Amino acid sequence: MYTVLSKVYLEVAERLSALIGTSQYYSGAFEIDFEDVSCRMVLSAVIYRHNETLPEGRVVDLIDNIIPVWWEFHTITEEGEVLNDFDFAELKEYLLDK
């Protein structure tokens, strides 16, 4: 079994955040390569947001929650696809604006 490292969660979160942008729904797939493993994320999710005014007066759109409708996380090595311990709850920790 492949153990998903925090560096992988961070890279997936950064890529996903860029793909989500300011949308309230995301449906798509993308791949990342990490060391000797190719990872493929498939996700359909509802994005809950709120606006917050910063001290300097600028308004920012922040993610409150992301609710997956469907998700898959595949890991492929030289030997083919292997099971992994990916946890969507852990990915959310990297995505949610605190």
Language-model segments: residues:
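Beta-strand elements of well-folded, non-transmembrane domains
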Residues: 32-51, 77
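Acidic, low-complexity intrinsically disordered segments
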Residues: 2-29, 54-98
